[in-house]
Amino acid sequence: MIIGYTYVEECIMLAILYLIIAIFFGTQLVRFLIPDIRRLYVGVAVDQQTLPKVPTALFLLPAGTLVGLLLTTFVTYFLSYVIHPFVPADTPTLLPSDIIAMCIFTYLGCLLWQRCFVRDYRKVKAQGPSKLGPFKKDVNTVIFYVTSVILVLSAVCFVYCYTCYMRGNNIRLGFSIFSDFAPHVAITSGFGVGSNFPTQYPHFSGDNIQYHFMFYFLTGNMEALGLPLVWAINLPSILCMLSTLTLLGTLAVLLSGRRAAYLLAPVLFLFRSAWNVFHQASELKALPGSTWSYVFKTITKQAVWYGYTIRDEWGIWAINVYANQRHFALGIGLVLILIFLFLPHFRRMFLHLSRIDGFKDCAKRFFISKEAWLPRENDPLHPIGSLILAGMIVLAMPFFHGSCLISALLVLFGMAIFSEFRLGYLGVAIVSVLSSVLQARFFAGGASNVASFKYYFGFVIPEIEGKNTAGLGSAIGYTGTVISYLNKMGFLTVIIPCVLFFGLLAYEIWFKKNLYRPILLIPFSFPLIFAFYCQVSLEVLANHKFIQVSFILFDIFIAGFLANLLALPIGIKERVEASGEKTQSGSIVLPKKAFIPTQIGSAIVCLFLLFGLTATGISEWCIYYNLNTHKSGYVELHTDSLVADWVVKNTNEDDIFLTPMWSTDDFFLSGRRVYYGWPYFAWSAGHDTETRQINYQWLLTGANGNVDEFRRYCNEMGIKYVIHSSDYYGTGETKDFYNPEFFAANLTEVARFDNGIVIYKV
């Protein structure tokens, strides 16, 4: 029997139907709250000529997908929380709430569609077709976007499916992800097969949950609705990553005016920039008798992360991080949507300041004008609708990805400084903080259990270790050390935005253009700065997500820069003169003899920069491929495990087990929780593993041989079963404490298996 698939044949399509309904609802909600996406594009784009290059669907579909999955999952969870005590034992726990949720969101989606249809019909009848430039559906443009989506989708599918896949009845998890993936599998099965309400951390039962688990409720729900565990995890991951990369590329096109940026932005996202491969190549070439062929072969065949900066050997900056942390892509996508929604207000401030003469009038406009704080009257952008959508996103976001929510607030704070409609930003911040506090209290017992903001300088830079509480004056003295670290770790992703900031700022000032693009780089850097000055969780290394968010946002500008280098926005003098057209301010024209070599030289520079930006990423894809080879680079979970099968059939969905300190084990496919699993996961999530380990070791002794005390404590913690396994003898934390004779003599044996595992009932 395959665990959790007892009713697959009857309801596997329910999972697909749920996703379709979620996406349908999300797209209709976005359409309803943002009535004119072309107008939103106008508020974001560098110029009007960019609009025909960008289809409306490139925002509507990915934003609708992410918003739909976010909100339907959020509502389904709380429906399940309320309903689960009343669900009959022979009915899957999530099925009733899923049916109710699908009915609700189908109705809401249809209602919103009908409202949008009537509104658009009346608008066209009263005002005629929109005067904004529609998408120009020429063959080359359509082919470009379709090809780009296919290429990006192929890359995304490879990243996710290469390290999480099925072979027969076995789930295979690649070597580079299986450890961190262990709690994700356990949480997914906890909802898909078990009943994890009130929700607790599966490797640390009895202490609420402090981990942002909501994405894995979605994957668990997919398993509950019939998808095999692998596809329950992979399918939502693919949808979220594809949507995020689509939004990233779309924003790059709008800000650069170059269509090629749509593909370049995802490429930069997937293949990171760093010094690693260049440093490694120089080391290899310096070896006696080394050749470039040897260097190339060594780099492409290696199966270990190259450790140039601290924790590079864990692959935390590599493509592996997205395979490991499946919820990260969703969080990044939501950050991008929030930027889209507020960027028009940011752009408007600079647009109107450029039309005002005199410092006094500019200061008045910037600080105390009505538009600086309140929405404009009869604004075609419909800012209230955008504000409602942003509020709904941050309301649901805290336990989907807390770090991305903090990153979003940091970016929005930076944008608000230079923006109109600042009270809108404030409203979003208030909703996010209130929602975070309430959810933290509900899930974790208090906000301090989830995040505690304190000053901590230097991230994980070894040279600053031990001096992380140094004052601001001392911290400034380490500026060179921080810059050196960023240069090694980010290379051109750090250098190019700095050059672009000053270069683009000078260009916009010289030609009297809107300054919003170079200034936007400032709020984009706020998560990066935050990562070096603040500690949010017990593990400072977790701040790497803030740095990655900033780097991803920088990629938007870098992609636009490369796209402009690839095809310079310059005209041919003879052609312009022959047409009789006037050149726009800031436009450059060259004689044909100069145009061709200039264009060729620019394209060559672009290709060299692209190589420098992606070389380390390409080498890390090679490592990812070699480390997780399908011949031997995996850990297997057996869906036909007799132990897990017995547990599913003979225990309650919310029963807790005393087990070895398991990390990745077949047992977790049963959806049951353990008292104390591998402690790193729980520790990094903020749980008190030190006290729990003392109590755990005491339990392994049989409460020092006191059966009454043992039963009392087990009853207090909800422990119903004890599993005997030789795995107790594999770690120093358990081998000297485990007393198998106590359990055999005092507890009732309920199951014994050929692999030596025995299950006792407390």
Predicted stretch roles:
Residues 1-137:
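Membrane-embedded, hydrophobic transmembrane alpha-helices
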Residues 319-324, 370, 375-378, 386-401, ...:
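Membrane-interface alpha helices of multi-pass inner-membrane proteins
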Residues 141-142, 152-334, 354, 630-634, ...:
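Active-site lumenal/periplasmic loops and adjacent helix-entry segments of GT-C-fold
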